[in-house]
C-alpha cells in the first residue's frame, strides 16, 4: 500500500512529488511521462451534470452534489462511499481509498488508474 498526499495540483509520497496535473487534463510523472489524459464535459441534456472521461471510463457528477455522490459508468470499476472515504473497486479487487477531506490517497493496486480517477474527481468537484 502507498500513502499519497495531494497539494496544489500535485501528488506527493513522503514529500517527494510523484504525479502532477499539467494543463487541465494531463496526469504526468515528474519526468514528464504521460500517465493518463482525461476530459471534463458538461452534459447539455441534463443541466448541471458534469462528466469526466478517461479512456472507456466515464465519471458523472451533478454540480451541486459532493464528490462522494460521483458515479463511475463502467461495468468493472465502481466507487463506493464508506464514511469520509471513497473506495475504488475493479472487478471485486480493492484498488484505492480516497479521502477528499484530508486530500489523501491509499493505493493498493493499479496506481496510474487510481491517480487519474483522483485528479478527475478533484476537477469534477471544482465549481
Positions of the model-derived regions?
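Intrinsically disordered, low-complexity proline/glycine-rich segments
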Residues: 1-127
Amino acid at each position: 500500500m502507498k500513502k499519497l498526499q495531494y497539494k496544489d495540483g500535485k501528488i506527493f509520497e513522503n514529500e517527494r512529488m510523484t504525479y502532477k496535473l499539467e494543463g487541465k487534463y494531463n496526469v504526468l510523472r515528474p519526468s514528464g511521462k504521460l500517465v493518463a489524459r482525461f476530459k471534463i464535459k458538461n452534459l447539455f441534456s441534463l443541466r448541471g451534470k458534469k462528466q469526466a472521461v478517461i479512456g472507456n471510463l466515464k465519471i458523472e457528477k451533478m454540480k451541486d452534489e459532493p464528490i462522494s455522490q460521483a458515479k463511475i459508468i463502467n461495468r468493472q470499476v465502481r466507487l463506493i462511499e464508506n464514511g469520509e472515504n471513497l473506495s475504488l473497486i475493479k472487478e471485486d479487487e480493492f484498488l484505492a481509498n480516497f479521502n477528499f477531506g484530508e486530500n489523501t490517497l491509499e493505493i493498493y493496486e493499479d496506481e496510474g488508474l487510481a491517480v487519474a480517477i483522483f485528479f478527475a474527481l478533484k476537477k469534477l468537484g471544482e465549481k
